[in-house]
Amino acid sequence: MFLAADRPTTDLPADLPAAIAALKQELNAVILAHYYQEAAIQDVADYIGDSLGLSRQAAAADADVIVFAGVHFMAETAKILNPQRQVLLPDLAAGCSLADSCPPEAFAAFKAAHPNHIVISYINCTAEIKALSDIICTSSNAVKIVQQIPVDQPIIFAPDRNLGRYVMQQTGRDLVLWDGSCIVHETFSEQRLLELQARHPDAEIIAHPECETPVLDQARFIGSTTALLNYSLNSPSREFIVVTEPGIIHQMQQAAPEKTFIPAPPQDTTCACNECPFMRLNTLEKLYLCMRDRRPEIQIPEETRLAALRPIERMLAMSA
């Protein structure tokens, strides 16, 4: 497999943001970046958002080239929605622990063991899992989508068990959960969170629903990255403990410089485990190189793409 990281980084232009802007014009490209990307990438992106927002931007894109600064499943989603456009990912190794926790063959067997269930899959999954699903959801719209399903219709929810438990709690529905999780959101602990809050008693705890239940129980507000951003801007509080990947704090600080945003620490204080190692594989240098060389490019077999497109389109229609 060819990786952006395999290329030499010599002869890079001195002003990478300017060079990226020039390439964007030359290629008629649009740069989409997730909130968890490093600040330098966010600063050159055309659109910054969560999975739902970026899916909508990808669906509406009129550029010839979509450069996706995120992880592999996000770039796949852009390609599923835009088969006629070139979709580039700065580093093909930028995967996802949650997506990896749900192998297609095992999930197909799991689905077969639960006949008459519809499958709602979190967008953090591979194209193959999307193709096995009936509806896709994001952390922004998962509750809303489940609420639209008839109460007598049994549901499989995959692949994130923590988001699934949160949806069950919010909707009162019983869901059959696939046992997957995100390594970043599982690194937060209730004990470390309470210790931090004791040092910042006026801070509001805001958390992503991929966190485990004991952590969510301590949160004043639970929501997607976009919801966390909006809540922090509209809340009268001046200090927040942010329990998700800390890349989102860049946008929070830019939007509300008068407020203080404290990243929640991981359970293991010897590592930066609250940072997504896959998201951080993308760098400004790799972004430039992928645009310059127009690779690595996302490719999806057409049969898989068409099967994965239908549940994404259902999500977009149900969350309009």
From Swiss-Prot:
GO BP terms, alphabetized: 'de novo' NAD biosynthetic process from L-aspartate
Residues annotated to bind [4Fe-4S] cluster: 96, 182, 276
GO molecular function: 4 iron, 4 sulfur cluster binding; metal ion binding; quinolinate synthetase A activity
UniProt remark on cofactor binding: Binds 1 [4Fe-4S] cluster per subunit.
Pfam families, per database record: NadA
Keyword terms: 4Fe-4S, Cytoplasm, Iron, Iron-sulfur, Metal-binding, Pyridine nucleotide biosynthesis, Transferase
Group of enzyme by EC: transferase
InterPro entries in UniProt: NadA, NadA_sf, Quinolinate_synth_type2
Localization (cell): Cytoplasm
Pathway: Cofactor biosynthesis; NAD(+) biosynthesis; quinolinate from iminoaspartate: step 1/1
Function: Catalyzes the condensation of iminoaspartate with dihydroxyacetone phosphate to form quinolinate.
PANTHER family, sorted: QUINOLINATE SYNTHASE, CHLOROPLASTIC (PTHR30573:SF0), QUINOLINATE SYNTHETASE A (PTHR30573)
Protein name: Quinolinate synthase
Organism: Synechococcus elongatus (strain ATCC 33912 / PCC 7942 / FACHB-805) (Anacystis nidulans R2)
Annotated gene: nadA
